[in-house]
């Protein structure tokens, strides 16, 4: 099938009729129609609470990272220490992280957090201190109250699906999450029992009144 990716196109409105989304509208007033809609807005998913009449309890959790330049194949394996880790890349870089902070949508890296990351990483591999740091940055993780993502049909809507709230495991769980959601939408046998991920959890004492 033909697939078109439309970048830099923030969506601002669901057009809901009789429990079904007929279309969505972007900030530039463009209207998009589809048979099924999937919410994959990560840390920003709570934005849809009012429109969908649901309290979506997904919050941003900041994580900071540091990137080293090392020789290729210098570090042969991933290392972990408490909540910190070292991940070698094929191009000779080593990713070091990561922190956790509840500071809203702030993505400003700080010197203090950098030092905390470095201390933990040098404890694992002291030799890493000999190599240059090429980058420090901060991102946002979508945290759910239990750490379990929401994957499946949204409550009270016939054609809206959730795939958000993966917290620290978005990249790791992404392919399996997409596969599971595809199976649910197409009513195919699922690779695992989807009950634990079901968005019906959003209706448990959290519906707005």
Question: What are these model-predicted stretches?
Answer:
Residues 19-24, 74-76:
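Short, hydrophobic/aromatic-rich segments at coil-to-beta transitions
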């Amino acid at each position: 099938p033909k697939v078109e990716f439309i970048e830099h196109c923030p969506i601002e409105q669901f057009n809901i009729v009789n429990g079904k989304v007929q279309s969505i509208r972007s900030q530039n007033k463009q209207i998009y129609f589809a048979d099924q809609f999937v919410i994959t807005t990560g840390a920003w998913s709570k934005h849809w609470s009012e429109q969908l009449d649901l309290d979506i309890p997904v919050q941003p959790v900041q994580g900071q990272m540091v990137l080293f330049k090392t020789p290729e194949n210098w570090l042969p394996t991933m290392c972990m220490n408490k909540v910190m880790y070292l991940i070698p890349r094929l191009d000779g870089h080593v990713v070091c992280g990561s922190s956790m902070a509840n500071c809203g949508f702030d993505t400003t890296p700080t010197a203090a957090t950098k030092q905390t990351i470095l201390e933990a990483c040098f404890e694992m591999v002291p030799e890493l201190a000999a190599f240059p740091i090429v980058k420090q940055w901060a991102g946002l993780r979508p945290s759910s109250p239990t750490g379990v993502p929401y994957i499946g049909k949204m409550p009270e809507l016939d054609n809206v699906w959730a795939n958000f709230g993966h917290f620290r495991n978005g990249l790791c769980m992404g392919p399996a999450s997409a596969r599971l959601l595809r199976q649910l939408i197409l009513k195919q046998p699922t690779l695992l029992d989807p009950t634990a991920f079901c968005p019906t959890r959003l209706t448990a004492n959290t519906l707005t009144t």
